[in-house]
Swiss-Prot record:
Pfam family, one: LIM
InterPro entries xref list: Znf_LIM
Domain LIM zinc-binding: 186-247, 248-305, 306-375
Compartments, record wording: Cell junction, Focal adhesion; Cytoplasm, Cytoskeleton, Stress fiber
Alphabetical keyword list: Cell adhesion, Cell junction, Cell shape, Cytoplasm, Cytoskeleton, LIM domain, Metal-binding, Repeat, Zinc
Segments of this protein annotated with the region PLEKHC1-binding: 281-378
Keyword check for Lipoprotein: no
Gene field: FBLIM1
Main localization category: other
Job description of the protein: Serves as an anchoring site for cell-ECM adhesion proteins and filamin-containing actin filaments. Is implicated in cell shape modulation (spreading) and motility. May participate in the regulation of filamin-mediated cross-linking and stabilization of actin filaments. May also regulate the assembly of filamin-containing signaling complexes that control actin assembly. Promotes dissociation of FLNA from ITGB3 and ITGB7. Promotes activation of integrins and regulates integrin-mediated cell-cell adhesion.
Top-level taxonomic group: Eukaryota
Record carries keyword Repeat: yes
Protein name: Filamin-binding LIM protein 1
Amino acid sequence: MASKPEKRVASSVFITLVPPRRDEAVVEEVRRAACEAWPGRPWESAPTKAPGAGSVGKLRSWMPPGRAAAPGPAVPPQLSNGGCSLPPPPLDVDDALPDLDLLPPPPPPPAADLPPPDEEPHSAMGASLISDLEQLHLPPPPPPPQALVEGPPLQPRPSHLKPAEEELPPPPEEPVSFPEREASTDICAFCHKTVSPRELAVEAMKRQYHAQCFTCRVCRRQLAGQSFYQKDGRPLCEPCYQDTLEKCGKCGEVVREHIIRALGQAFHPSCFTCVTCARRIGDESFALDSQNEVYCLDDFYRKFAPVCSICENPIIPRDGKDAFKIECMGRNFHENCYRCEDCRVLLSVEPTDQGCYPLNNRLFCKPCHVKRSAAGCC
């Protein structure tokens, strides 16, 4: 039965050596030759086979040429394990014996961790060990690893950056993207979809439209590149816009430009005039007769204003002020003409002592009326 695999640790790498199955005589010869070829240890003798020992022995580690074994503590030569009494040297990763039945060793560690090779190899041990391996038809051990050739130290490249700039990390590279279409934030005011810069667009009424969306809202006529009218925020063509316009209350034509609204109708400025003098009323005040004819104020007062019975002038408001018409005994008077005929005091329209006390179709104040009545004459 094979012995338990030995585990050795070198340079922080775990190496597992599996002993091969060989004849006892061949293994013992290899051990004996290795022990005899080891120099500088005269007190150790060749291993002997114990009577009744098993048919499987232990294969000892070996050192390649150019490696010096580390000194170990002295071990008594009286060992009963059937092998050599020489303590095994420390096993290195690069110095493990490659066997036919063993797994290949792992890659060597960096050159900095490897110990420098010895300059004086043990020629006697190497020669005897190679001859024994040739008899067993085994390949010779690999040559010791050579130290890496150190090149010239790297020279730092001259830097033209300032110290503050050298401390800053490089900016991240922006990914290069190739969009299929350019981004746009314009939205069509009709279909509420994005207006791409590659599409024909119309800008009107401070909004963006697709060329096919900018149409008359009544007849759906294309308005791109055409004159249009705006009404209530909607684009209209000229015929549809004229259909929405009001017609003049006098001539019956459509009012396209300036419009005058009066009497619940629309008029052209040239149609809204005085029926007497044909003067344009415009934004001035006007008056109507019983037939709803339009008059300017001057012509209306001349024709329809009452006449004062004292001065015989029409009672017309002046300077934009309202004028009151005073009626008494079927006659009309100006406010300034409504006075007592004897003392010329202004009469009040209220029934007070300052009011009018007529006598024989004449205007008197109360004191004058009493005097005239007492005298019995007018």
